[in-house]
Amino acid sequence: MPEINTDHLDKQQVQLLAEMCILIDENDNKIGAETKKNCHLNENIEKGLLHRAFSVFLFNTENKLLLQQRSDAKITLPGCFTNTCCSHPLSNPGELEENDALGVRRAAQRRLKAELGIPLEEVPPEEINYLTRIHYKAQSDGIWGEHEIDYILLVRKNVTLNPDPNEIKSYCYVSKEELKELLKKAASGEIKITPWFKIIAETFLFKWWDNLNHLNQFVDHEKIYRI
């Protein structure tokens, strides 16, 4: 694996690069484990390295979507606006559990607490709804990138927020119209959004949003959307 100098990066974020992500093949079968650092190096991504991830979309009882702006300390895509929470299940027994995507949902609960300070008891795994999976690849810069099969998770609940400033620069709840305005700002270069959020917003998000009371029609645990 290539050696990358991380001396100039945020120390807390560098520590997280040692976490072990779940390596998978293109059909989401586990084939091993590798550090978060090696999973996100473009040099390895170009050789086909692929890992499991998730994206949470949390709506409050007013049907507004919780967005976050990634902190400037983040190694990949700093300062970008994105959906509620995006991260990775780790290669440990609790988060490797594949039955009903329980491991991924446990990981989402863990990261909602770590990033946004949402108490664990407010987002138990059984209240995190697994819709489908999306396979995508995108560069952050010349060194770092993303290559993931992303589990799409939806939550509908009012929650308590206490964000970690090392993870999150800002957050807001948005209506559909407010998100459309934000996407226009991103298209004009006024703000930055993450590539996976752009992809999901342009393809699936508004269909889900229009049908929050009828999400069963979008549940597909067999297909992996290649985007």
From Swiss-Prot:
InterPro entries given in the database record: IsopentenylPP_isomerase_typ1, NUDIX_hydrolase-like_dom_sf, NUDIX_hydrolase_dom
A GO CC annotation given for this chain: peroxisome
Record Pfam families: NUDIX
Compartments where located: Peroxisome
Chief place where the protein resides: other
EC number: 5.3.3.2
Family the UniProt entry places it in: Belongs to the IPP isomerase type 1 family.
Subunit structure of this chain's protein: Monomer.
Function: Catalyzes the 1,3-allylic rearrangement of the homoallylic substrate isopentenyl (IPP) to its highly electrophilic allylic isomer, dimethylallyl diphosphate (DMAPP).
NCBIfam families in alphabetical order: IPP_isom_1 (TIGR02150)
Name under which the protein is recorded: Isopentenyl-diphosphate Delta-isomerase 1
